[in-house]
């Protein structure tokens, strides 16, 4: 999907349609854009850019707070549309899906793509556009979809079709990796494709280079997304405090919101954690420092009450009269594992009971303890 988050905001709010729009995690000048509309990109505004810089580039840019639940709803609608067109659909991210064309002949590729775009337009809205790439594997198809944006359609039949691209245009190659490849005399995509498996492995310094050799040649056994972990081993959030929150009271308010967000993600991924780390950094005119504390390591727990109590106890260990002003706060749940892999105590309630409790308690917690609402009220 093209500029997924900002397109949803434009679709659901007429005043944003065809206007430069960026989406931010919270409404403050001290954050960055997580999405930018194509109208905003025309002014040089892009994802990852600070709000202050975006406003400098175009003072009238619309700054919209992210609404994750709306994006999930639109994602689910999109997946249902795809399942009507294809037998097998693999979700790569909230705005990326890979579809199997095994039962569709090559002469029907364009018609199927046009039909899919039409359904997205009718059911999701005129602001929602997608770029479709077709190739032998997911990696090449992703590259193809990025070649003509927005609302593009591209077929890549061979790695030779990529020769006109820059190395940094390929997913998985950033500026740091590009410099590393340059040291191995790899300056273009053609240079990359001309090397054998052993040479690429040497250039990467790991087996990843060998995987690239096969991905570039359309291999399905070594493809994009196959080597990313589905379940995070840590879940963390950090926040730089805005000027009006640089007090211990303000820092604690943000700290509570971060804990709630972390617990939300534990529930979302159905994870248990063994340890909680917290930190508060501070600055003064002459010095700076950071307080870091960790909870005792436990067998594993997904109990929200337990972790909230641990968070409060850890916060109490931070001196109230710190030498400077609070600058940032952060939390991190570590050693996470899937709930189904937790060894339960013989004296605890069965897992189904905990699931039942979450089923009925979670909606209340979201309604009355929404961390996003806490940010809105405090910033």
Predicted regions and their residues:
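DNA-contacting surface of Y-family translesion DNA polymerases
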Residues: 182-325, 341-343
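Polymerase palm active-site segment centered on the conserved acidic dipeptide of motif C
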Residues: 113-137
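Catalytic palm subdomain of template-directed nucleic-acid polymerases
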Residues: 98-118, 148, 185
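Acidic, metal-coordinating catalytic segment for phosphate/diphosphate chemistry
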Residues: 7, 296-379
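A residue-level signal for conserved active-site and pocket-lining positions in enzyme catalytic cores
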Residues: 44, 54, 95, 132-133, ...
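Compact, charge-rich alpha-helical regulatory domains located at protein termini
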Residues: 122, 134, 145-221
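Residues that scaffold, gate, or flank divalent-cation-dependent active/transport sites
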Residues: 1-94, 98, 116, 214-216, ...
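Short Gly/Ser/Thr- and Asp/Glu-enriched loop/turn motifs at secondary-structure junctions
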Residues: 92-96, 127, 135-138, 271-275, ...
